[in-house]
């Protein structure tokens, strides 16, 4: 049992209220002006924000098969440090969770080592990127969160349509990395001014938007919940907006780096700045920000993608795609958008908690009496510089090295258990 004393919570109007919070038996037992108990542990939250634990539906934990990049243990420790209490793990592992047996082994490893709640995706196709569909029913029974071939777009419309019909029959979502392989052209960055300046092959916007346009029509025909991963282009935002207006069950996420950066921020041919989707144009970034504010884009997800140093400390042509994000998402977004009065604090918290929960029907994301005690305590006054050497993640690959941010998680509780406290050793 914990009593979080002298903290602040956000009410429905977005106003801060001084409150104590009692955690008992894994639940939020009481929220009141003052709580006094004779037993349990007191946590001093004076002047700090007590918020629902963050939810990230797009995380690469790399295990099994990529433990040199990340493990379930290190990735979930990073999640806890970043304030995340629920994360969804992508299936681009070796082996791929494309069968009941592999999924059950993965679930057992998660239960054994994870520091936060991990909901694993199953793949859509066997081995990722094939045209052979997995056994949807068996994988749902084994605990799959949803189905995705993340990292690879499903190339054949017929394969995607059949997958959507099977997912819809089980009331499960198809989650898509949207990329038409015939339109990538071997690109490593956005097909724009940086690619032209550096003489690099570019990935055009249509590689993403064309596949989303196809898929929303397939989702309409199949009656399926279709979720777009890491949306990055203005055309994609327009397609999703039109689909929502037409009543199609489509949702979309955006990553922090696509909201904060565009291609003009890239300093040179440096593998630390290589990600997929790539950093797009200023116009694309503006469309993402507009889409998030008007509800076209539903929430924020990190696409945490750790790699070993030797896979990133090389030119873009040789580097792996991806950056880490779990430990820096909140401070970066709070600094860039709340501190500048572009967003309210409540908007940011909602996009990291209740919005993803609502999209995927998860019973988390709210701080109310009776809810699961998934909680992050945030010090909105704390200022610190992003230093990969302090990361709990094995991945140190971030373009935000040296950036000073304000607003950091200082404690994280999962089902009432303290899983991270600032100042304690890794």
From Swiss-Prot:
InterPro entries: Amidohydro-rel, DHOase, DHOase/Allantoinase_Hydrolase, Dihydroorotase_CS, Metal-dep_hydrolase_composite, Metal_Hydrolase
Coiled coil spans: none
Keywords, comma-separated and alphabetical: Hydrolase, Metal-binding, Pyrimidine biosynthesis, Zinc
Binding site for Zn(2+) 1: 58, 60, 150, 303
Pathway linked to the protein: Pyrimidine metabolism; UMP biosynthesis via de novo pathway; (S)-dihydroorotate from bicarbonate: step 3/3
Pfam families noted in UniProt: Amidohydro_1 (PF01979)
Catalytic activities: (S)-dihydroorotate + H2O = N-carbamoyl-L-aspartate + H(+)
Residue positions of the active site: 303
Annotated Zn(2+) 2 binding sites: 150, 177, 230
GO cellular component terms listed in the entry, alphabetical order: cytoplasm
GO molecular function, one term: allantoinase activity
Stated role: Catalyzes the reversible cyclization of carbamoyl aspartate to dihydroorotate.
Protein name: Dihydroorotase
């Amino acid at each position: 049992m914990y009593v979080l004393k002298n903290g602040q919570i956000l009410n429905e109007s977005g106003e801060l209220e001084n409150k104590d919070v009692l955690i008992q038996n894994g639940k939020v037992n009481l929220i009141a002006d003052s709580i006094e108990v004779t037993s349990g542990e007191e946590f001093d939250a004076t002047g700090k924000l007590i918020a629902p634990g963050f939810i990230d539906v797009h995380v690469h934990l790399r295990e099994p098969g990529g433990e040199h990049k990340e493990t379930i243990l290190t990735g979930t420790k990073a999640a806890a440090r970043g304030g995340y209490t629920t994360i969804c793990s992508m299936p681009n592992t070796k082996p791929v969770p494309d069968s009941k047996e592999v999924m059950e082994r993965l679930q057992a490893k998660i239960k054994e080592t994870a520091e936060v709640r991990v909901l694993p995706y199953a793949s859509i196709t066997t081995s990722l990127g094939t045209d052979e569909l997995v056994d949807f029913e068996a994988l749902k029974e084994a605990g799959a969160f949803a189905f995705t071939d993340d990292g690879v777009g499903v190339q054949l419309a017929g394969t995607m349509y059949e997958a959507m019909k099977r997912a819809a029959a089980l009331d499960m979502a198809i989650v898509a990395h949207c990329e038409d392989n015939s339109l990538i052209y071997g690109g490593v960055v956005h097909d724009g001014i940086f690619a032209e300046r550096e003489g690099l092959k570019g990935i055009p916007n249509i590689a993403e938007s064309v596949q989303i346009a196809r898929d929303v029509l397939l989702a309409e025909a199949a009656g399926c919940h279709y979720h777009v991963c890491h949306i990055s282009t203005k055309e994609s935002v327009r397609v999703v907006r039109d689909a929502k207006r037409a009543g199609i069950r489509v949702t979309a996420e955006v990553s922090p780096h696509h909201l904060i950066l565009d291609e003009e921020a890239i300093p040179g041919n440096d593998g630390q700045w290589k990600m997929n989707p790539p950093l797009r144009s200023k116009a694309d970034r503006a469309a993402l920000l507009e889409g998030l504010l008007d509800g076209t884009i539903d929430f924020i997800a990190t696409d945490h993608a750790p790699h070993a140093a030797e896979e990133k400390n090389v030119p873009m042509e040789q580097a792996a795609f991806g950056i880490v994000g779990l430990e820096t998402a909140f401070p970066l977004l709070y600094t860039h958008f709340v501190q500048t009065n572009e967003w309210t604090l409540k908007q940011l918290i909602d996009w990291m908690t209740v919005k993803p929960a609502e999209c995927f029907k998860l019973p988390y994301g709210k701080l109310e009496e009776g809810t699961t005690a998934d909680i992050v305590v945030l010090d909105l006054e704390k200022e610190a510089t992003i230093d990969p050497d302090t990361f709990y993640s094995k991945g140190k690959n971030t373009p935000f090295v040296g950036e000073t941010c304000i607003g950091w998680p200082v404690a994280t509780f999962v089902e009432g258990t303290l899983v991270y406290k600032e100042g304690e050793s890794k």
